[in-house]
């Protein structure tokens, strides 16, 4: 299959050819891209191809779901997250999925393609929404378990909404952190208070390896920062729960004081995908406030050997069938120590991106071309992952729910699941410090 860079360039050229009739005497598609005629044609093409239309599934639980963004401290040392939560109603407008064009430019950089690819992606997906009520009021009257969520390499806070919304619909508050360690394709902060007041964002883009630079030191340093950012996000949310006055730098309509006395402080977990899965492991080893963790298709390369024995909390690995490889599984198995609660399942026919919203946002052709979809239906894959997660969370957070109806999924008992792993590690000589299993882009 073609590399993702060639995929993106192929799609770009195809779109340009369809909407811009090439005149080889006057070929200037970059100048033409801003014209109303070009935009109109590309939008017609999108409609015909069924691209960029919201298909992100609604939550399957009984709660309506709200969504907002929170930024505490405008600097790049502060906390930035997207919050999903049970809401009083869902009559607010749906949430814009990817809210700034710079995220698309960051994704094009992550793919190693021309910035024009980011422009086209913005046209495809820039108006797409996700089914959560923007700035809706928190549903009051009960305390909710809290989940901190960590995104993968090249991702950002908004593109795991299918997971966040479903968990919130089952009665969780989910805080999806946007990391400032250089692993997000894009993120932003403000340089000073005056920049905040006029909305002048300072953008941080993906930190790439320099020529001759070793990867492990960079990724391990990023991993440690990610873990600190997850713990910092937890501390801030618990401060709000205690009634400490805080200001959301983004000055949205959502009243942060609603969160006072809303958190069940004994029921806190962490979930993450890929690099975020490694972040789950690092965070559990450092912060005992997290009662358990779930690593979705974890990329284990950044984890130092000293960490594996320092995780007393229950840990659940949910893997895709096509991403994992022997050295990565060997690292996971280092976590399986005596008297430690560990579980692992693999979703048959799934790919790494089955955990990311792009698997729902694209047609079958585009999905298969970019490996955003596997052989399994995307809705089935995310449903299995979410239900197994809920069952695991009920057991280890002591929830009084009915999620134990899915206990069998935690054991891999379903025709779409494999107990443990599909990867054979027998006699595999893993050279762990020189692994070639680099995490693929979230559009791969």
Swiss-Prot record:
Reactions catalysed: a 1-O-alkyl-2-acetyl-sn-glycero-3-phosphocholine + H2O = a 1-O-alkyl-sn-glycero-3-phosphocholine + acetate + H(+); 1-O-decyl-2-acetyl-sn-glycero-3-phosphocholine + H2O = 1-O-decyl-sn-glycero-3-phosphocholine + acetate + H(+); 1-O-dodecyl-2-acetyl-sn-glycero-3-phosphocholine + H2O = 1-O-dodecyl-sn-glycero-3-phosphocholine + acetate + H(+); 1-O-tetradecyl-2-acetyl-sn-glycero-3-phosphocholine + H2O = 1-O-tetradecyl-sn-glycero-3-phosphocholine + acetate + H(+)
Alphabetical UniProt keywords: Glycoprotein, HDL, Hydrolase, LDL, Lipid degradation, Lipid metabolism, Phospholipid degradation, Phospholipid metabolism, Secreted, Signal
Subcellular location: Secreted, Extracellular space
InterPro entries: AB_hydrolase_fold, PAF_acetylhydro_eukaryote
Keyword presence, Signal: yes
Stated role: Lipoprotein-associated calcium-independent phospholipase A2 involved in phospholipid catabolism during inflammatory and oxidative stress response. At the lipid-aqueous interface, hydrolyzes the ester bond of fatty acyl group attached at sn-2 position of phospholipids (phospholipase A2 activity). Specifically targets phospholipids with a short-chain fatty acyl group at sn-2 position. Can hydrolyze phospholipids with long fatty acyl chains, only if they carry oxidized functional groups.
Name used for this protein in its record: Platelet-activating factor acetylhydrolase
Gene that encodes it: PLA2G7
